[in-house]
From Swiss-Prot:
Binding positions for ATP per the UniProt entry: G170, D171, R172, Q173, T174, G175, K176, T177
Site (Required for activity): S363
Assembly: F-type ATPases have 2 components, CF(1) - the catalytic core - and CF(0) - the membrane proton channel. CF(1) has five subunits: alpha(3), beta(3), gamma(1), delta(1), epsilon(1). CF(0) has four main subunits: a, b, b' and c.
Gene: atpA
Subcellular location: Plastid, Chloroplast thylakoid membrane
Entry protein name: ATP synthase subunit alpha, chloroplastic
GO terms, molecular function: ADP binding; ATP binding; proton-transporting ATP synthase activity, rotational mechanism
Pfam families: ATP-synt_ab, ATP-synt_ab_C, ATP-synt_ab_N
Matching InterPro entries: ATP_synth_asu-like_sf, ATP_synth_asu_C, ATP_synth_asu_C_sf, ATP_synth_F1_a_nt-bd_dom, ATP_synth_F1_asu, ATPase_a/bsu_AS, ATPase_F1/V1/A1_a/bsu_N, ATPase_F1/V1/A1_a/bsu_N_sf
Catalytic activity: ATP + H2O + 4 H(+)(in) = ADP + phosphate + 5 H(+)(out)
Membrane topology category: Peripheral membrane protein
Organism: Tetradesmus obliquus (Green alga)
Main location: plastid
Disulphide-bonded residues: none
Top EC group: translocase
Amino acid sequence: MSMRTPEELSNLIKGLIEEYTPEVKMVDFGIVFQVGDGIARIYGLDRVMSGELLEFEDGTLGIALNLEANNVGAVLLGDGLKITEGSRVRCTGKIAEIPVGENYLGRVVDALARPVDGKGAISTNDTRAIESPAPGIVSRRSVYEPLQTGLVAVDAMIPIGRGQRELIIGDRQTGKTAIAVDTILNQKGKGVICVYVAIGQKASSVAQVLNSLKERGALDYTIIVMANANEPSTLQYLAPYTGATLAEYFMYTGRPTLTIYDDLSKQAQAYREMSLLLRRPPGREAYPGDVFYLHSRLLERAAKLSDALGEGSMTALPVVETQEGDVSAYIPTNVISITDGQIFLSGDLFNAGIRPAINVGISVSRVGSAAQIKAMKQVAGTLKLSLAQFAELEAFSQFASDLDAATQKQLARGSRLREILKQPQNSPLSVEEQVASIYTGTNGYLDSLEVLDVRPFLSGLRTYLTNNVPQYGEIVRKTNTFTPEAESLLKKAITDFLAEFGATKSN
């Protein structure tokens, strides 16, 4: 190897000096002066932004929520057991983001989209901000496609459309989660991506939902996001936004999605806990003043996108728990005013054996009727009115000793129509099966049967139609209308099966 001359070395060093560009990196550091209950107060951090991610010495992340004159109030995204007074904190210059992608399907993740199902890491290339702006007016189109729940009471009288926000509200133990899970099960084979967000629930309850979905092959198109009751309130507060972010990835690729928030009462309680610990002024029921914005910015992300954006959709089914049926409490009234309708579940109906325990009289869907398929409109047009009149007559008949024949007939018809709405859990029905059941009831074919025989008869009729008259189902599925041909096929099938059912009963 030849020796370099001093001139060559000098020129080489000069060249390197000329190429060198000094890189000055400023990092904003702060010092923790108080920590506890998932909250840290920090001196310094003069340039921190609201909602910015902070990184503590031990690797724990936090979010800056309170920017005060002398300190910053931050919530911790973890237990923070190793954070002490005097620990250093640095700004990251980022807001909270999570990875998103196809590989999340069939997985169970926490509020930061980290897998918790023991199936290993989730590989993905894309990320999205947890707090994303909702689509604007120009980015949306009106709801026009149905999202079938598989429940006769909902699809016939409180129809839901893709891109709608429909509240499920009721007391504890009235079947709110059951309706949500049935809706997920009914999306099988329809290309809808489902996200189930469990907020502040027992791990055993989430495991039950997971098993229901797994047994029926619904986990393949579902993501479960969980922030259990034993997790920090920060994670319970973030979980719904994480669920919405995961669903948004699929929505913006032009696919229909369904997001269930179970339940937003617990998220509001977690946010109240955080706000009180941050010493924000309490308002009604000790909730902070921005608790309405907490839910509105979440639910406004549900939309039916315009053609230009790929016509994807996110349908939101938020769940809210009431106390003793009181829908005038703060959180229920807030969410009712944000959503496009509500399915109200009654404890009295549940205890009377009417399940799903939907109170059809006060449940409403504000935009879903535009999305209801024509076949259902044709057969279920008068169903809600008939049931409302029946409920009124039933209450009146308790005080009347003798009733005329017309009233007795109306009461008999009403009690049979109510049987049509009863459905066992995890047994969603297809549209053609629902249409057949409603048509049978509204046209008086069930009047000759005992009330207790109605459900066995309808179950048998559905099997009879599938095995012996498959062309009826094909017509309704393909045309989405109840054509004269479909009606004549159904009439004949009902008449034939009535005779068969009567013969079986007499034997």
